């Protein structure tokens, strides 16, 4: 895809002005890093506040009296009981229980506000419309940008521009206003830090981003550091760590499936692939692989698609994401291994350029999460 065919976010001119190195991502021209570089951007986010352009992601509204029940029929997640103002992580599944996409949704009272991955948004929209378009109105929000402000000082900076955001706690959201622009802000993100995601009208996005960058705590952060931050936080990247061939149980996302949708729950099953997913949850269908955290015992980064073996040379899985964790200060990774080798502390070998690198199965996150829960 040439530059001329790449889509541009509302902040494209600002990225260029800031000296960003732009790369193709999910069909958009996106900043992978700014002149400060990935390491500096990563550390700044963990210490202060980083501003990310995530406008490539899909935003949509589901509207109508039946919207919650309809949306719940697509996911192994409790949508119906989600209180107004609360946000939840969700998983769209196919009929084999594979993950079509992971997403976030908020009950805003008069609608469900949904944020999906950029590379999946057109497919997700078609899937949602096909499955539940007759039960509720599905309205893409193409005219809005999306910013993420992440880090321990995010609240300090954002509160100056948007008073009242400090009242939000992790996984809640609310409507705010900035210079006449209607904002919808959730206290959430994908870095493991406290922070916010801000939906803003596209025609106000650049001015709002400039106002945030004028705050002393805030610096721009690109996709490179976004990736290292989310991996240290133990969070999946769709297309790398989860895809249509992985089930939520294989992906160790059991926590995302509430009790009410599980065997014995009041609304058990009733989602695509339920028979398989519930059998895996209940242990009646044994898993063949499981997502785990991994730490390299030598200072050698272990990248995606690296083969994992037992010390005896038997292939038992592969790495799906891996890099030298800037805050962890060691090579961290996640990947899939056979369940017999998934216990924390299990020693494995990653085969890097033909040589075995010793690794150990580790708990995640690799860096403690610092979400603000009130």
Regions found by a protein language model. Give the residues of each.
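Conserved, structured C-terminal
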Residues: 1-26, 30-34, 107-374
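Acidic, proline/glycine-enriched N-terminal capping motif
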Residues: 1-90, 98, 223
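Internal amphipathic helical hairpin motif
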Residues: 65-99, 154-181
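Conserved thiamine diphosphate
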Residues: 102-106
């Amino acid at each position: 895809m040439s530059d001329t065919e790449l889509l541009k976010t509302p902040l494209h001119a600002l990225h260029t002005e800031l000296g960003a190195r732009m790369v193709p991502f999910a069909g958009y021209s996106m900043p992978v890093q700014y002149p400060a570089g990935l390491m500096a951007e990563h550390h700044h986010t963990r210490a202060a506040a980083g501003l990310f352009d995530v406008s490539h992601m899909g935003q949509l509204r589901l509207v109508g009296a039946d919207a919650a029940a309809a949306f719940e029929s697509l996911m192994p997640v409790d949508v119906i009981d989600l209180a107004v103002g609360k946000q939840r992580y969700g998983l769209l599944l196919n009929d084999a229980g594979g993950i079509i996409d992971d997403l976030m949704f908020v009950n805003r009272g008069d609608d469900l506000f949904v944020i999906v991955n950029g590379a999946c948004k057109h497919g997700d929209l078609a899937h949602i419309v096909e499955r539940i378009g007759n039960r509720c109105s599905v309205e893409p929000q193409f005219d809005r940008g999306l910013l993420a402000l992440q880090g321990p000082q995010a609240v300090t900076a954002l509160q100056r521009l948007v008073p009242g955001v400090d009242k939000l706690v992790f996984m809640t959201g609310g409507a705010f206003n900035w210079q006449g622009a209607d904002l919808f802000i959730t206290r959430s993100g994908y870095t493991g830090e406290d922070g916010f995601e801000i939906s803003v009208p596209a025609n106000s996005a650049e001015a709002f981003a400039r106002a945030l960058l004028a705050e002393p705590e805030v610096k721009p952060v690109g996709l490179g550091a976004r990736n290292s931050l989310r991996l240290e936080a133990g969070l999946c990247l769709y297309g790398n760590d989860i895809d249509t061939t992985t089930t939520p149980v294989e992906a160790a996302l059991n926590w995302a499936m509430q009790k009410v949708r599980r065997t014995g729950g009041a609304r058990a099953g009733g989602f695509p692939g339920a028979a398989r997913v519930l059998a895996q949850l209940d242990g009646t269908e044994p898993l063949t692989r499981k997502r785990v955290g991994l730490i390299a015992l030598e200072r050698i980064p272990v990248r995606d698609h690296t083969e994992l073996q037992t010390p005896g040379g038997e292939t038992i899985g592969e790495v799906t994401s891996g890099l030298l964790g800037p805050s962890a200060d060691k090579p961290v990774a996640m990947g899939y291994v056979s369940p017999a080798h998934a216990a924390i502390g299990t020693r494995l070998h990653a085969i890097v350029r033909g040589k075995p690198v010793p690794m150990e199965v580790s708990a995640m996150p690799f860096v403690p999460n610092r979400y603000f829960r009130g």
